[in-house]
Amino acid sequence: MLTVALPKGELLKNSIRLLQSVGLDFSAFLDSGTRQLQIPDTKGLAKALLVRAQDVPVYVEYGQAQLGVVGYDVLREKQPQVAHLVDLQFGYCRMSVAVKASSSYRSPLDLPPHGRVASKYVNCAREYFHSLDLPVEIVPLYGSVELGPITGMSEAIVDLVSTGRTMRENGLIEIATLYESTARLIAHPLSYRMNTGNLSDVIAKLREAVLVEV
């Protein structure tokens, strides 16, 4: 039976809607009363796992799920061994460098050498500043990253931005974009190559559904 790993949070509703368009209904996950983390679709053709977004590629890489939906930001940060299949064209956001609006920094290159940058995306942040040949200390933070510059713990942050409202309300401005992110369809590499459970048919239908939506 096909198993799909779905992310909790903002991508879930659109992920379920997309799967419904190809005949796989996991809408029970949207019921506020449910506590189930694994459910079959209404026709018994597949099942879905509801997991943290960061864990989607782990379940896919280790073969517990043949397909998964996850943000490109997670794939860039984690670099999992999975097959990248389709840009699903929803869940748009961007990975940005931000600083206090009251600071003099208007470009990452304005930041002082060996300054501090707070981020939950440690690998992406390190890779970006390495590409600029600017040595900085990456400070791992996993909640309210905006507090880094506000409290003076860091000169800047690297974080995911959707509307930018949270940053504006906390007196921060974006000074650079590392990359843009959307939801992606990924697959377990061996299952994809061997077409386990007619996986290629499901993928083809999902590709077509995305094209129709665009």
UniProtKB/Swiss-Prot annotation:
Which keywords does this chain's UniProt record carry? Answer: Amino-acid biosynthesis, ATP-binding, Cytoplasm, Glycosyltransferase, Histidine biosynthesis, Nucleotide-binding, Transferase
Q: What is its main location?
A: cytoplasm
List the PROSITE patterns: ATP_P_PHORIBOSYLTR (PS01316)
Q: What class of enzyme is it?
A: transferase
Query: A single GO CC term, please?
Result: cytoplasm
Q: Name one Pfam family in it.
A: HisG
Q: Which Gene3D superfamilies match?
A: Periplasmic binding protein-like II
The UniProt family comment states: Belongs to the ATP phosphoribosyltransferase family. Short subfamily.
This molecule's function is given as: Catalyzes the condensation of ATP and 5-phosphoribose 1-diphosphate to form N'-(5'-phosphoribosyl)-ATP (PR-ATP). Has a crucial role in the pathway because the rate of histidine biosynthesis seems to be controlled primarily by regulation of HisG enzymatic activity.
Write down what this protein is called.
ATP phosphoribosyltransferase
Q: What is the lineage of its organism?
A: Bacteria, Bacillati, Cyanobacteriota, Cyanophyceae, Nostocales
